[in-house]
Structure formats: structure tokens, C-alpha cells
Regions:
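Active-site neighborhoods of divalent-metal-dependent phosphate/nucleic-acid chemistry enzymes
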Residues: 68-114, 141-155
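Alpha-helix/helix-capping structural signal
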Residues: 8-9, 38-41, 76, 117
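A general structural signal for well-ordered alpha-helical segments in protein cores
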Residues: 40, 58-61, 78, 97
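Generic structural signal for small/hydrophobic residues in well-ordered secondary structure
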Residues: 6-8, 21, 43, 81, ...
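Amphipathic alpha-helical segments within well-ordered protein domains
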Residues: 44, 62-65, 82
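Short, well-structured N-terminal submotif of metal-dependent ribonuclease cores
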Residues: 1-35, 47-63, 133-139, 144-146, ...
Length: 155
């Protein structure tokens, strides 16, 4: 199975917290996890907006992209975006999230995110959460024991 990692999951990998995200990533074969160029753009923007630890953050992002390929956004992804935008036009949704969702659907892979609510009701999108307790738990209180893996859910 292949996975597209959302921005929050990439940040968890860079920070190494929560540990269950890294544990899950380690079970995959090389190339099974990818990120959208949209996620890469969000990570770059975050890096550009902050000044503390700039060199360290540059190295961390370079290391991440050396291990997790960045997929270009192509015509098929743009077509999926148009369909999703039309299907959910009355809902106020983040454009970057719509682009990431469309990208995952266009290549037929599961989107891994800790923001399941942000991706609810996207046509054809399959979502999986590798860090279900991360949003509700402070980093210092994250359990060392990884939770049971949730099966993918089609949303």
C-alpha cells in the first residue's frame, strides 16, 4: 500500500514526536510513503516564516525529502481538484487541503493525516491517521506504547 503524508505528519516525522508516527513509517518499504508538492510548499513556507533554528530546519527538511519523495502536481491532480471544488463548493475549506486531497485521489493512494476532520467528505479520498492521540495529548505526555493501528476509512 502507498501513502501520501499530510503536512502535520511530515512535521511529526521531522520532530520525532509522537513516536508512533515514526514507528509506523519504519514498517513501510522505501517509496511507499510520498508527499505532495503542496505539502512540500507548506513546509517551505513554515521554514521561511520562522528565523529560529533556520539551518537546522533546512537540514531536517532536506533529510526528509531525501527519504520521502515529493510528487509533482499534474493535470490529473488538477482535474480531481476541480471535481472536489465543485462537489464541496458550499463548504468553507482550506485550498491547500483541497489540493492535497485531490493529489492523493488522483494517484489512488491513502492520505495520512492527523486532521481527519479537515478531509471529511472529499469524494474518493481514503484517510488514515497514524497519530490519533497526538492532537489531544501534549508532546510530553505522549504514550510510549503505540496505539493499535486504525484501518483506513473512506471519507
Amino acid at each position: 500500500m502507498r501513502y501520501m503524508l499530510d503536512t502535520n505528519i511530515c512535521i511529526y516525522i521531522i520532530k520525532g514526536n509522537p513516536p508512533q508516527v515514526l514507528d509506523r513509517l519504519k514498517t513501510l518499504t522505501q517509496g511507499s510513503a510520498v508527499m505532495s508538492v503542496v505539502t512540500y510548499a507548506e513546509l517551505r513556507a513554515g521554514l521561511e516564516l520562522q528565523s529560529a533554528n533556520r539551518a537546522q530546519d533546512e537540514r531536517a527538511l532536506a533529510f526528509l525529502t531525501s527519504r520521502i519523495p515529493v510528487l509533482p502536481f499534474n493535470e490529473s491532480a488538477a482535474q480531481c481538484f476541480g471535481v472536489m471544488r465543485a462537489a464541496l463548493r458550499e463548504r468553507n475549506r482550506n485550498t491547500m487541503d483541497r489540493l492535497i486531497a485531490a493529489h492523493a485521489v488522483s494517484v489512488g493512494i491513502t492520505l495520512v493525516t492527523n486532521n481527519e476532520a479537515d478531509f471529511k467528505d472529499y469524494p474518493g479520498l481514503v484517510v488514515e491517521n497514524w497519530a490519533p492521540s497526538a492532537a489531544a495529548t501534549a508532546p510530553s505526555k505522549v504514550s510510549k506504547k503505540a496505539p493499535a493501528r486504525k484501518p483506513p476509512t473512506k471519507v
